């Protein structure tokens, strides 16, 4: 059976933690749609186009990956892509509460969509895009936090 999943996020910017989740999801599914969100509620450091470009570069070596942007409800995007599985990453208990609420909200909007939660490997558990942005703001070195493929682009 052919299976595909959506891994949504703002990815501002993509981190090694995101890439860790993507690589592990590739072992579980035939296709992963990395859905870069155009979230008007978030003030992003990078434009939507740049975030899509960075994600494409970071995942170019992974054949199961398709990168797209979206600006709708996630469940609507999932329906459009005929996808019934959403992947989310959990770094800490603080992520769990928010992700659980979002998972239930998505389920209430479409009962056929399930959310799968993956934890990153321990060495990536502390990495977040907001940490990377904070370091970048002060011209710090983030090379150990982001995929090698995008270092020159930041």
UniProtKB/Swiss-Prot annotation:
Keyword Transferase attached: yes
Chain sites annotated for binding substrate: 10, 42, 74, 88
MF terms (GO), sorted A to Z: ATP binding; pantetheine-phosphate adenylyltransferase activity
Main EC class the enzyme belongs to: transferase
Residues given in the record as ATP binding sites: 10-11, 18, 89-91, 99, 124-130
Pathway: Cofactor biosynthesis; coenzyme A biosynthesis; CoA from (R)-pantothenate: step 4/5
Main location: cytoplasm
Matching InterPro entries: Cyt_trans-like, PPAT, Rossmann-like_a/b/a_fold
Residue stretches spanning the membrane: none
Superkingdom of origin organism: Bacteria
Protein location: Cytoplasm
One GO process term, biological-process aspect: coenzyme A biosynthetic process
Signal peptide: none
Record keywords: ATP-binding, Coenzyme A biosynthesis, Cytoplasm, Magnesium, Nucleotide-binding, Nucleotidyltransferase, Transferase
Record site: Transition state stabilizer: 18
EC number: 2.7.7.3
UniProt key word DNA repair: no
A Pfam family assignment: CTP_transf_like
Function, in words: Reversibly transfers an adenylyl group from ATP to 4'-phosphopantetheine, yielding dephospho-CoA (dPCoA) and pyrophosphate.
SUBUNIT field: Homohexamer.
Family in the record: Belongs to the bacterial CoaD family.
Protein name: Phosphopantetheine adenylyltransferase
Protein source organism: Nautilia profundicola (strain ATCC BAA-1463 / DSM 18972 / AmH)
């Amino acid at each position: 059976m052919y299976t595909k999943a959506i891994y949504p996020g703002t990815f501002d910017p993509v981190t090694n933690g995101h890439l860790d989740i993507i690589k592990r999801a590739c072992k579980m599914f035939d296709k992963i749609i990395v859905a870069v969100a155009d979230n008007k509620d978030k003030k992003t450091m990078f434009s939507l186009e740049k975030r899509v470009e960075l994600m494409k570069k970071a995942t170019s070596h992974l054949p199961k990956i398709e990168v797209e942007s979206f600006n709708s409800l996630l469940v609507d995007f999932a329906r459009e892509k005929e996808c019934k599985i959403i992947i989310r990453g959990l770094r800490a208990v603080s992520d769990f509460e928010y992700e659980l609420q979002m998972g239930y909200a998505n389920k209430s909007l479409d009962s056929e969509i399930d959310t799968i939660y993956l934890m990153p490997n321990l060495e990536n558990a502390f990495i977040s895009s907001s940490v990377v942005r904070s370091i970048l703001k002060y011209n710090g070195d983030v090379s150990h936090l982001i995929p090698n493929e995008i270092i020159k682009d930041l």
